[in-house]
UniProtKB/Swiss-Prot annotation:
Catalytic activity: malonyl-[ACP] + acetyl-CoA + H(+) = 3-oxobutanoyl-[ACP] + CO2 + CoA
Pathway where this protein functions: Lipid metabolism; fatty acid biosynthesis
Cited InterPro entries: ACP_syn_III_C, ACP_syn_III_N, FabH, Thiolase-like
Organism: Bradyrhizobium sp. (strain BTAi1 / ATCC BAA-1182)
Function, in words: Catalyzes the condensation reaction of fatty acid synthesis by the addition to an acyl acceptor of two carbons from malonyl-ACP. Catalyzes the first condensation reaction which initiates fatty acid synthesis and may therefore play a role in governing the total rate of fatty acid production. Possesses both acetoacetyl-ACP synthase and acetyl transacylase activities. Its substrate specificity determines the biosynthesis of branched-chain and/or straight-chain of fatty acids.
Family matches, as NCBIfam families: fabH, PRK09352.1
Name listed for the protein in its UniProt record: Beta-ketoacyl-[acyl-carrier-protein] synthase III
Keywords: Acyltransferase, Cytoplasm, Fatty acid biosynthesis, Fatty acid metabolism, Lipid biosynthesis, Lipid metabolism, Multifunctional enzyme, Transferase
């Protein structure tokens, strides 16, 4: 017998305002065709003035708790993946904890940029499996619109705001790949690439927030190889394969990266969950947002094996296999 982190429910939240490619094309030198052909993105959501990362996260968490049909007071761990916190400190996770009326247990932020949700999931899973906590909220939430240079057409068209969450419950299972819950997680990073995708500000360096900067070609060049390698690690750890998984829910950064990764791994296109067209790249929020879409539309069902992967600034990257 072993302890697994079983998914009880998921939820998401998107700001009301939708920004289409056409709206961006009216402000900067770009076009809907240019954006769609290179990224697959058609629109993205942008947080309203006064709407913070914590607000998005609280709404997503409430939706996940409702879907799981559990009392918020049963949560004793909150791990929030974000690169756009409300404040330098305290952690945005404690604002979420307070917003949910939870005043016990532990809550903290985890920063791995677009890999943030996979890192948060792996962290919560290890805490639950160790017996330190019993029930966790794992959240990815971002307001990337606040760190974009809206005059840089190579980056401002890519990102959006949003939040998604999972409720994980520690349950005893048989210890095989037939178990429900998180089956394996694999995390990687390589700081030699830190200048290829970064924000040019921070409290220690410039005392400013800064803007996102990216060498797009370099990111694309490394992405597919890194993503596929860490997925192979997950397959080898569990004995599962591209043929035996039910769904592939990748970080929604760019449709070309997703398509190339799926092709290299021989994952059938019909198994790939794509939401990048409607959400853009929401960084740490993208995977739980996509999961919630696929659960709500009936694709992901209890017992399905779901493969997750992400890559972000640093570079950081990771994978997870979860039986729903």
């Amino acid at each position: 017998m072993t302890i697994r982190s079983v998914v009880l429910g998921c939820g998401s939240y998107l700001p009301q305002r939708v920004v289409t490619n056409a709206e961006l094309a009216s402000r900067i030198e770009t076009s809907d065709d240019w954006i769609v052909q290179r990224t697959g993105i058609r629109e993205r959501h942008v947080a309203a003035e006064g709407e913070f990362t914590s607000h998005l996260a609280i709404n997503a968490a409430r939706a996940a708790l409702a879907a799981a049909d559990v009392d918020p007071q049963s949560i004793d761990l909150i791990v929030l993946g974000t690169s756009t916190p409300d404040n330098t400190f305290p952690a945005t996770a404690v604002a979420v904890q307070d917003g949910l009326g939870i005043h016990h247990g532990a809550a903290f932020d985890l920063q791995a940029v677009c890999s943030g949700f996979v890192y948060a999931l792996a962290t919560a899973d290890n805490f639950l499996r160790s017996g330190s906590f019993k029930r966790a909220l794992v959240i990815g939430a971002e307001t990337f619109s606040r760190i974009l240079d809206w005059n840089d057409r190579t980056t401002c068209v890519l990102f959006g705001d949003g939040a998604g969450a999972l409720v994980l419950d520690a349950q005893r299972q048989d210890g095989t790949s037939a178990d429900r819950g998180v089956l394996t997680t694999h995390l990687r990073s390589d700081g030699r690439h830190k200048a290829k995708l970064y924000v040019d500000g921070g409290p220690s360096s410039t005392q400013t927030v800064g803007h996102l900067r990216m060498e797009g070609r370099e990111v694309f060049k490394h992405a597919v190889g890194m993503i596929t390698d860490v997925i192979v690690d997950a397959f080898e750890a569990t004995g599962l394969s591209a043929e035996t998984i039910d769904w592939f829910v990748p970080h929604q950064a760019n449709k070309r990266i997703i398509d190339a990764s799926a092709h290299k791994l021989h994952i059938a296109p019909e198994k790939v969950v794509l939401t990048v067209d409607r959400h853009g790249n929401t960084s740490a929020a993208s995977i739980p947002l996509a999961l919630d879409v696929a659960v709500k539309d009936g694709r992901i069902k209890k017992g399905d094996v779901v493969l997750l992967e992400a890559m972000g600034g640093g570079f950081t990257w990771g994978s997870a296999l979860v039986r729903w």
